[in-house]
Amino acid sequence: MSSKNFIKFFIYITFCIFVLHFVFSILVDPYNIWHNYKIKNFNHDKPKAFFQAYLNKDFNINYLKPDTVFIGSSTVLLGFNPENLQTNQNNQIYNSGVDSGSPKIAYYILKNHLEKPNNVSRVLLGLDFYFFNNDLEDKKHFKTNIEIYKNKIVLLYSRSHLYDSLYTIYHNLNNSENLLVINNYGYLDSKGVEEM
C-alpha cells in the first residue's frame, strides 16, 4: 500500500468513526437534550440526566420555551411539580431546580435565559436555609466553565458523554430500576421519562 493510499484510507476511517460516534450519541441522548424518540430497552430511561441537570435543564428551557420557570435548590426540584400547577395548555411551566443549588447557580440560570429570546414571563425563586450554604459553590457537578458545553456538538464528542451513552444503553438493557428521573417539566420523580 502506497503512502498516498494509506493516508486516504486513514482519513476515510477517521471520518467514518466520527460520523458513527455522532449518530450514536444523538440516538442514545443520555442527557435528554436532543429530544429524540425514546426506545424501550435502548434509550428510554436516562439515568445520567439527573447528574448533568445543569446542562439538561439549560437545553430543555431553550427547547420547551416555558412561560414560568422555578429556580432554586433540591427543595424546588423535589417540592414543586409543574404538572400540578399547570392550569391550561398555553401556560408552560418548567422546574429548573437543581441539586445543591445556590444563589450563584440560580443567578447563572436566570442570567443565561434572560439574555436569550424566550417566553419567560415569571421566575419563581425557591428559598431555604441550605440555599445560602457557601460550601455548595464547589460542587464538582457545577463548573463555571460549563459554557464550553453550550455547544451540543462539543458535548457530543466529550469522553463523559460517550461513557454516559454506553451506561444509558446498559441501564436500559438490564431493566435497572431508575428511581431518580427528571420528567419533561424538570420535576424529579420515579415514574420514568415521559414521551415529549
Roles of regions detected by a PLM:
Residues L20-V23, F42-F50, T75-V76:
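Short acidic/polar alpha-helix capping motifs at helix-coil junctions
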Residues V28-A49:
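Alpha-helical transmembrane signal-anchor/signal-peptide segments
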Residues L64, F70-R159:
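Membrane-embedded segments
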Residues H44-I71:
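Short extracytoplasmic
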